[in-house]
Structures are given as C-alpha cells and as structure tokens.
C-alpha cells in the first residue's frame, strides 16, 4: 500500500512541474485570458530566437530581422565545480530523504517478534482439561 502512495506522490510532483500548455489542450487554452499571470497560448518556439555555436565556442542568436548577436553568458557567483557539487548535494539529500522515509515506513509496519509465552502445566486451569 505504501508503494502505491509513494508512486502517487512522485507522479503528482511530475505532473505539477509540467508546463501548463502541455496539460491544457490548445482549444481550451485559447479561450482563457492571456493577461499577465495567465496562460499564454503562443508557441514559444516562434518567439525564441534560435541559437548556434561557432567553432570557436561563441554562441550566436539569430534575430528575427536576420541579424546575429553574440549570446551573453550569465555571470555566476560560483564556479562550475561548485555548482556541480551543489547539484550533487541536493540530489543526495533528496535520495537520503526518500530512503529514510522508506526505512521509517518499513520499521513502523514491521511486525514485532515477541516470543510466544507457553503456558506451563502448573498454570493450566484444571477445569478446562
């Protein structure tokens, strides 16, 4: 039973992180308001300029008017190895949390193995025999 609960929780997390436009069909989403904070029905591939990488390693964006400009890289306060370490630490934390919850559920559902008490012949009620 707990396996089903864990599967449902994992699937609910996956579903809640999906893009809204994947969940809502285009016909329904076109009827919804498109103001700020609401669902956009436009295809993002039309608005996003395409990118290509030069052999030198520089990324270029193709602008809608046909021009190109060099893509600016974000400046991070952490270096690449530190970011990788942070990602691995978060993954490890999630895995440890899941395993500890599974262990706790296993401990709570495990039947206690108390030794069965055997009645000695002196303790038996003579009227029962």
Curated annotation (Swiss-Prot):
Lineage: Eukaryota, Metazoa, Chordata, Craniata, Vertebrata
Keywords (A to Z) from UniProt: Glycoprotein, Membrane, Pyrrolidone carboxylic acid, Sialic acid, Signal, Transmembrane, Transmembrane helix
Subunit annotation: Homodimer. Component of the ankyrin-1 complex in the erythrocyte, composed of ANK1, RHCE, RHAG, SLC4A1, EPB42, GYPA, GYPB and AQP1. Interacts with SLC4A1; a GYPA monomer is bound at each end of the SLC4A1 dimer forming a heterotetramer.
Function in brief: Component of the ankyrin-1 complex, a multiprotein complex involved in the stability and shape of the erythrocyte membrane. Glycophorin A is the major intrinsic membrane protein of the erythrocyte. The N-terminal glycosylated segment, which lies outside the erythrocyte membrane, has MN blood group receptors. Appears to be important for the function of SLC4A1 and is required for high activity of SLC4A1. May be involved in translocation of SLC4A1 to the plasma membrane.
Glycosylation positions in this chain: 29-30, 34, 40-41, 48, 56
Topological region Cytoplasmic: 104-129
Mode of membrane association: Single-pass type I membrane protein
GO CC, one annotated term: plasma membrane
Family in the record: Belongs to the glycophorin-A family.
Extracellular side: 18-82
Chief localisation class: membrane
Gene3D superfamilies cross-referenced by the UniProt entry: 1.20.5.70
Pfam family, one: Glycophorin_A
Annotated positions of the Pyrrolidone carboxylic acid modification: 18
Signal sequence extent: 1-17
Transmembrane segments: 83-103
Official protein name in the record: Glycophorin-A
Subcellular location: Membrane
């Amino acid at each position: 039973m707990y396996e089903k609960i864990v599967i449902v929780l994992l699937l609910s997390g996956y579903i809640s992180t999906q893009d809204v436009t994947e969940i809502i069909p285009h016909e329904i989403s076109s009827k919804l308001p498109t103001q700020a904070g609401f669902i956009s029905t436009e295809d993002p591939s039309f608005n996003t300029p395409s990118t290509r990488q030069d052999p030198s390693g520089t990324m270029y964006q193709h602008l809608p008017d046909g021009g190109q400009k060099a893509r600016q890289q974000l400046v991070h306060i952490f270096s690449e190895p530190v970011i990788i370490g942070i990602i691995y630490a978060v993954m490890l934390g999630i895995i440890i949390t899941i395993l500890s919850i599974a262990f706790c559920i296993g401990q709570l559902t495990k039947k206690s193995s108390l030794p069965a008490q055997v009645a000695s012949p002196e303790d038996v009620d003579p009227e029962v025999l």
